[in-house]
């Protein structure tokens, strides 16, 4: 693994080339995927991703480069390529960078890391969830259950002296089912997701109840009558609906979109952009919640950001 002093030298090389801002993002991520198709385990898939990303900013121009060669020499070469892409001509006087290491509280503590758990234990929870879904009193025509876990270690450093790390662990079980009765069938999927380690499965009732509820809910939808044309309120439930907010508002509020004035929200702070009923909060500090962490991917501590309040940006 690259050393802190080597990271400092890479960042200093960026400044010496005249680059205004440089940020290094190191990642070492392990993933496991175990698919179960119609009660049959399809094998265990393990993946490890290790590398570094380099983000450079010069005025309103920016480039992102990456490599799986996490060495000082490879990163120095990446900096030179980035400077060429930014078409930087003038070099700057050598300036020393002091990297100050900071650590922050992680709102999602882990008890059982995925690497500490045998594949057989992971397979067992898959089969238990499968069995629970099939015993829910619903005619399940087909059922696939997938187990996933991720253990991501990150290190972020930049030319402003930031140096920090985080470890993010998630565990997920995805269920895909088709419930049927004769020619009437309905297919759906849902995720049992926890921002934790394998302790997510300590309470067997929790994930087996999830499995039963998922197929029962699918059967209720299958047997539901058609709705008559009418005007109804739009209600966004907790969970996956957060993706709708992310796509409709999140990207438009990103710094790059604002800087390039390509967002509909440019110069709209303090103005009405939505209904009075809309309040949008981005909170990465909620304990045990998926998406919470100690830091974001720029190395800043997570916080509660009110993006839209009562319709006002």
List each language-model region with its residue ranges.
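Active-site bordering "gate/hinge" segments
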Residues: 1-304, 309-312
